Amino acid sequence: MTVKYQELFIEIAKRVGAEVTQVENLQAAAKYISNISKGTTLVPETPLATKHSLRSLLTAEGIDVFIGDFRKAGHMPEGGVTFCNFCMADSGTVVLESTDENIRLATTLPETHFVIVDPEKILEDNLAAVPAMTAMHEGSEPRFVAYITGPSRTADVERVLTIGCHGPRELHILLVNNISTDLMEN
């Protein structure tokens, strides 16, 4: 986990269509999000969201944070905000343990997905991620793990590239230092 991997991650993530921005702290991240997400925003209740009072920070910036079962949000939410477990620099991929349905919905329903990443969680490649993936799957319960590389895109039947057809049109990765170095925590 070095700056070398952070630079590679930024380069590749941008190449696959993500916006990557270094922000000073979570307050600055909330401000950034408020400049883009003007409507209802989904923020799943995760250990890191609770630990860092993410919902309160976003609400203080004027963001309409939906609380509850995201299936009942009532209309298409504009934004979704999540933390990640770790990233893989060589593909610009963000990895989230998404067994909780609200996490999955926050990453797929909105037009814009914001992912908060501690740069210490950027691994070199998928081989470096094997120990974390192994630990993630320990235990008897199956888990859902999402690999997100850029905004949603498809070129189905007619081979015409469409952005945002099966998920967010935009992916914003916000690099924030000192959030968490625990690869199991999101």
Model-derived regions, located:
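The feature marks the mature, well-folded catalytic cores of soluble enzymes
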Residues: 1-186
